[in-house]
């Protein structure tokens, strides 16, 4: 009974630690939605502004009289309905998406992957796997067999990219990145 209790506590601690040390939490799609949201919010605000300007321009009264009318809430239901109809035609806002540092890092990872699709280690700083902490790496790829300089291409959480030798072992890194870097956890 006592052994089962210790094992369950150990299991809980390991899982909790793994959850806290995951790589990037934001996906590319979420970051793209965040960028589109900002543009869509500006477009909607401009549309609403144009509706309000059309409403003001369509009045035969002077601007002072229009402002007095609006401040005293004496405008007619017809003009108010026209304004509502105009605003209803404005584009809706999409989901907010993701923004911030996570998206900046995600963009850097996506850019590095696009610029080096094979994951070759040419022109990248070589480091030993023991010099890396598990919370320091946000992306990992194994170089393609066609690369002249092969290894594991890693992106650190500061945005820099480094390579570790192909025969490296680091149990803390390979686990998170699926099949691409799982060999890091298996080599002896």
UniProtKB/Swiss-Prot annotation:
GO terms for cellular component: extracellular space. GO terms for molecular function: cytokine activity. InterPro entries: Chemokine_CC_FPV060. Keywords: Cytokine. The keyword Cell inner membrane does not apply. It comes from the Viruses. Belongs to the intercrine beta (chemokine CC) family. Highly divergent. This is Putative CC-type chemokine FPV060.
